[in-house]
Each structure stands twice: as C-alpha cells, then as structure tokens.
Amino acid sequence: MYTLATHYRGAELCVELDEEEARLLINGLVRQCSPLSNTLRLSSTVQTDYEWHEFIEGIITCNAEVIKMVLVANKAEIAEKEFSP
C-alpha cells in the first residue's frame, strides 16, 4: 500500500492506494474512494479551525515508472510524494 499523510490546520489528511482502490481519509474517516485508474482525483470539504472550511483534494497519477500522490487544500499543494511501483 502507498500512503501520503499530513497534518493541516488541525486535520489529519491521508491518501491511500492499494491493488484495488484509492481512498481519501480525513481524521481517519474515508471521505471518498475510487477504483484504480491512471489519474484519480478524490475530494471532500472539511472544517478546519473554528468555522473555516477547506476543499481537500487527493490527486494520484500512476504509470509504469512512478506513482505520484499530491494533497491539495483550496488549490494550494500541501504535500507530495513519489513512489516506484
């Protein structure tokens, strides 16, 4: 399993990828999952801080050479990681 996790404004964000599907988790809860494909975009809105909401995206790009995971909050990249398949 491939995982990218970060702490952002009081929320624990995580993108996971295994042989069957990809998942976006926020504070340990699966917010969206999707079957595998070359490019996946998983998203959810989360409350961070008091009455502040963020649009969170997990973007996963897969090809024969590399698996790239990116976490984005309100269109700003907050974490990135590459893996060799």
Language model regions located:
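Cysteine-centric segments in proteins
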Residues: 1-85
